[in-house]
Amino acid sequence: SVKIKDVNGDGKINADDRTPISRDPDFTLSLNTTLKWKGFDFYMDWYGVSGRKIRNGYLSESNSGGSLQGKLNGVKVNYWTPFNPSNEFPRPSHNTNVTYHGSLAIQDASYIRLRTLQLGYTFPTTWIKKLQLQKLRVYATATNLLTFTDFLSYSPELTPGAYPESKQYVFGINVSF
């Protein structure tokens, strides 16, 4: 069964034990850099948030009609079994209807994501003059490569009904005549 924490320590579970949360993060983080060396260029963009608490729809009433039932849309949950005596989530069953499922679903949605990574090479002018070109650059770009988070879902940025961010790989050529 689920046990609710006596937050204020008065020995009673009541409205005084409620803890306010906010969807707004404590910090928003961003780091991007461009490095160039002998025709090579490298670009990297990291983004993240820290201290954001949200209701995880995969663990709350929007999933399986309000009960865990062991079906969590492919998200692995650390629930109690005789072989795994965890106290993170109650053991799911078809008869389980967790009364406090809403509080179980509040999770830290902090994350750090590598949004963009690009590597390119611009050919020297002496090489491309023979081809009657002013500029020739080849590059590869990848987006949404990595996300570091403890949030139990496909993405800490999206609701369960949305498609997760796709990874994209682009190869290109820039030519100036």
Model-derived regions, located:
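Strand-connecting loop/turn motifs
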Residues: 37-40, 126, 133-135, 145, ...
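Transmembrane beta-strands of outer-membrane beta-barrel pores
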Residues: 37-39, 48-52, 116, 123, ...
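C-terminal beta-signal and terminal closure region of outer-membrane beta-barrel proteins
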Residues: 72, 81, 99, 145-177
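A short local loop/turn or secondary-structure capping micro-motif enriched for an aromatic residue
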Residues: 22-25, 51-53, 156-158
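Outer-membrane beta-barrel transmembrane strand signature
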Residues: 1-43, 89-109, 114-116, 120-128
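Extracytoplasmic gating/loop element in the C-terminal half of outer-membrane beta-barrel translocons
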Residues: 49-137
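Short acidic, gly/pro-rich beta-turn/loop elements at beta-sheet edges
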Residues: 43, 54-56, 129-131, 150-152, ...
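Membrane-embedded beta-strand positions of outer-membrane beta-barrel proteins
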Residues: 44, 138-140, 173
